[in-house]
Structure formats: structure tokens, C-alpha cells
Amino acid sequence: MEFSIKSGSPEKQRSACVVVGVFESRKMTLPAELLDKASGGYISDIVRRGDMEGKAGSTLLLHSVPSTLCDRILLVGLGKEKDFREKEFASAIRTAVKVLNETGAFDASIFLTELPVRKRSIAWRVRQTAMIALDATYKFDQFKSKKEEIRRPLRKLTISVERRNELAPAEEALAQGLAIAEGMAMAKTLGNLPPNICHPTYLAEQAQAMAEEFKLGCEILDRAEMEKLGMHSLLSVARGSHQPPKLIVLTYKGARASEKPIVLVGKGVTFDTGGISLKPGAEMDEMKYDMCGAASVLGTMQAVARMALPINLTVVVPATENMPGGNATRPGDIVTSMSGQTIEILNTDAEGRLILCDALTYAERFEPDTVIDVATLTGACVVALGSIATGLFANKDALARDLLDAGEDANDRGWHMPLWDDYQELLKSPFADMANIGGRWGGAISAACFLSRFTKKFDWAHLDIAGTAWKSGADKGATGRPVPMLAYYLLQRAGKLN
């Protein structure tokens, strides 16, 4: 889809469709009023009759409105004006784009971006509109032999700004929003791919292709190289699989060489059976999504490279399958991590932390400013937070606040979870430095505590996305989260968030 920014009055738009809003109860927004005036009260007559009440999520498509230059006008219900905030704005944009895609209009001009959202700039509104528009039209159907094609899909969206002095910040925000949306789409596609295709080698190939396209540094470590580094915790997870494990490293240099990099570490378990501690068969297919942490950091790297942010960024992805087999790790095995700390593996289905701990130790060599790991780590986090908020842990409160703020800005929220020393007691082992599980209670916290033992040399945050990385049910599929949160955080760090 093509996007453009324009400043102008709605009644003067030569477009296949113009989109304007109506609040409850039947209160037209200024762009709607301008169209109504041009049409001699045609729209207000329809609204008065009750065809459009302004309820949130409602729409009404009008054809050939008198004395207007557009073919169609789409009225979008916005709900109560006093309640119109970020969530309502996003919902209105998503509704509008989905309906537009089915109207037969090749191009449209959207005036919802002119609506004030408390404490949000025009740049925020445009950036969000671009992100939502691409996300709303995303489809994953490459394995369908018969695809459901939209006869005349929307091909061009013009985003309106009220004043000409808003054009420059809106153009910059549009480019940012499209880059973030494309990063989300990449993360979603990697997550949605079947595990017989998206295995560790495939992930490595995608990273290499991205490195070539965006002139990134790329290094792929194989099993032998990881053995030399002493990554026995990571490799213990790979022992049951015929698919070779990979450690994927991408580097982006947008700032001075002296500036310390931010490192993103993404869990890349491309299929998780649980290993010898086998999962139940029901819904095991969804364990292809256990690499969504890897997908999200790769998508974030793509977004940063597209935006050409003035930062240094490194992405590390430990990638493997977790399979049962004659050579698979057993409950009770003890391994030595790259850090030298020993781990008693009481449950082979708590494998994410076993690959992440070695990746976090590996990250030390970059002398990072900050390290953020992203992982579909624990079912306990889903129990605690459901599918709304990502679980956020950090060894520095300031870092946690920055990520929480980024999540609020991006409509990709997180919740700050405790990382108190009291919980470290849960990981005690009589035979090794630590166990890889901490018992039934506080599972998301004990998992984060485990990882914290490998992060003593840098500021670190952990995002548990087990509840937010994908959806089940009728809308089954990867969500692309937390690419928006991470991208907004990096935009803020780069001083490019308006």
C-alpha cells in the first residue's frame, strides 16, 4: 500500500473515498461538518435520521454525495468524545482501514488523524495510523492453494494533517510508522511459518538476507563454535533434534564506534515439544510460536535499519528446536553454562532460560550499554497478565520505566514485575549452582531470577511475551509484539521520537 501526507480540506479531495468521524450522539467532527456544508446538509440529514449514531466501531458508507469531489464518504463512529483517547483512536483507524479495503476504493483520504488525542502530537497520530493500517491489512496465506483475493483492495492511503507546518513532522513519523509496521509484519510472518520450514537454519538464512539488504554485520555460529565457547546450556536443549542449532548475531552501526551498543537477545526455539518433559499433545502446534522472541528482535533490527537511527544495535538469537530423542537431555542432567555456573535441569520444558543464559553471557563481549532479552518464556506470565500486557523485569528501575513508557506510547503495553532477591531461593539445587525451575508458584519471576544471574555486568531487562506474542482461536496468528515497544524505546534513545 502507498502512503502520503497532505494538508487540505476534505470537500476538495478528488479521491475514491474520504474518511471522517462522528462522535456520539451524532456529533460530527470538523472535517465531517465541512463535507456536510459543501453537500448542502446531505450528511447531517442522514445523521439526524439515525443511520449513524456515532457508536464506536460503527461505519456508514455514502456514495455520490452531492457537491463533493470524492466518489464515496466513509463515516466512522468514534464513541463518546470525552472518552476519545489512544485506544479509541487506534480502534477507529483499524475499523476504517478494514472497511476501506472492502469498499472497492483504490485510494482514500483519511481525516481521522486531525482529531485531537490528549497529550499526543500529530507525529504520534500519523505514526500510529501507518502502523495500524499495515497491520490491519496483513495476511498470511502463502500456503493456501486457493487464496481469498479482495477484488479491488485499497492501494493508496492519504493521511491528512490540519496545518501545513505539520507536514514535515508528519512525513518523518510516517516513515517511522511504516518501518515499524514492516518490522512487525516480518516478526508475524516468521512466527506464522510452519516449523518444518522455519527451523534454526532458516532463521539464520533470513538474518543473512537482512544483513545483505541493509548492510549489517552478520555472524552465524554453528554447534562446533558454540562448543568451543562452552555454551553447554544452550547446546543441551539442541541434543534431541536433528536440526542443527545456530547462534545468530547481527550488528547495526548508526552511531560513533565509541558509543556502546544496545543488545537485543531473542529466544529462538523454533519448535518446543518440551523435550523429555513432553508437553500435552493438545495445541502443541502453537509451539512453533516459541521463537517469537527471535522474530521480534529481528523485526526490530529491520525497523531500526530502515529508519537509519543514529544508534549502535546488536541482535543475538540463540536458535534451536527442543525435541525428545535418544540423545536428548534428561531431567536431572547437570550442565555448565558459558558463564561457568552449573545448572541442574529438573525440567527440560524450561528450556528457554537455558539458551538465553548463554546468549546473555555471549552479549558481554559487546560491552553493551543495555541488554534486553525477549522470550515466550513462561506460562506463568500468561496466568498472571493474560494476553494484554507483556511481563517486564529489569535490574534497573530507570530502564523499566523507559520501556513501560515506550509501551504506552506504542500501544504495546508492559507491566513491571518484581525481581526481588527473596525469589532467588526458589532456584536452589543440592547438586549444582542452581536448578532451572523454581517450583509451581511465581514461575515467571523465578525464570527472570534465573536469567538475572547471567546479567551482572550490564543494565538488563527481560520481556516475557508468552501471553502477547500470538493469538489463539478464530484470529490465530502471531501479533508482532513487542516490536512496537522496542522500536519506540530505540526511537527515544536515538532522540527521534516526536
UniProtKB/Swiss-Prot annotation:
List the EC numbers from the record.
3.4.11.1, 3.4.11.10
* Active-site feature positions: 279, 353
Catalysed reaction(s) here are: Release of an N-terminal amino acid, Xaa-|-Yaa-, in which Xaa is preferably Leu, but may be other amino acids including Pro although not Arg or Lys, and Yaa may be Pro. Amino acid amides and methyl esters are also readily hydrolyzed, but rates on arylamides are exceedingly low; Release of an N-terminal amino acid, preferentially leucine, but not glutamic or aspartic acids
Single GO molecular-function term?
Answer: metalloaminopeptidase activity
- UniProt subcellular location: Cytoplasm
Alphabetical UniProt keywords: Aminopeptidase, Cytoplasm, Hydrolase, Manganese, Metal-binding, Protease
Q: Which GO terms describe its cellular component?
A: cytoplasm
Write down the InterPro entries for this protein, in alphabetical order. Leucine_aapep/pepB, Macro_dom-like, Peptidase_M17_C, Peptidase_M17_leu_NH2_pept, Peptidase_M17_N
Swiss-Prot/TrEMBL cofactor(s): Mn(2+)
Q: Where is the signal peptide?
A: none
Q: Binding residues for Mn(2+) 2, per the UniProt record?
A: 267, 272, 290, 351
Pfam families, sorted: Peptidase_M17, Peptidase_M17_N
Q: Which CDD domains match?
A: Peptidase_M17 (cd00433)
Q: Which GO terms describe its biological process?
A: proteolysis
Family, similarity comment: Belongs to the peptidase M17 family.
NCBIfam families per UniProt? PRK00913.1-2, PRK00913.1-4, PRK00913.2-4
Role played: Presumably involved in the processing and regular turnover of intracellular proteins. Catalyzes the removal of unsubstituted N-terminal amino acids from various peptides.
Q: What is this protein called?
A: Probable cytosol aminopeptidase
